[in-house]
């Protein structure tokens, strides 16, 4: 098996996986910047009815797009995401000034080789350079 197959096998509790096989794997971390976090939190509340989050430590929000909001609407967006993080116990909330999403995750050690990370943007696969299976652009509603 290649590296990705090994990671997926371990995360799904299988001895091995093969290309084309559908697996249910444990995701180690979900990463979102402020814009996608706003969408995801709204879908979670309004379309999925809220509820509980199994493990808030496996979620990270990084404000790197509108961290210095130019409009009231942008400020409200950040406020909503902050409120959501507090309400659901999400400690990995990085306000503006920490850097871009994926640098923040790497620099704060929120990853380890062999893990699975998902995100909402096309840069998420950068973690592959660190021995992580990472995929982005899966669709904000799917996170």
Segments from the language model and where they lie:
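Fe-S-dependent hydro-lyases/dehydratases of central metabolism
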Residues: 1-142
């Amino acid at each position: 098996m290649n590296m990705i197959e090994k990671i997926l096998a371990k995360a799904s509790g299988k001895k091995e996986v093969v290309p084309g096989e559908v697996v249910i794997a444990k995701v180690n971390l979900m990463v979102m910047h402020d814009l996608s976090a706003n969408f995801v939190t709204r879908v979670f509340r309004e379309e999925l009815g809220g509820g509980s989050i199994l493990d808030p430590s496996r979620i990270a929000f990084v404000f790197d797009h509108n961290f210095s909001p130019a409009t009231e609407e942008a400020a409200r967006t950040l406020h909503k995401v902050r409120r959501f993080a507090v309400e659901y116990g999400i400690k990995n909330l990085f306000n503006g000034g920490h850097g871009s999403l994926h640098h923040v995750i790497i620099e704060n050690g929120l990853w380890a080789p062999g893990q699975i990370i998902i995100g909402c943007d096309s840069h998420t696969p950068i973690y592959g350079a660190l021995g992580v299976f990472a995929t982005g652009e899966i669709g904000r509603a799917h996170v």
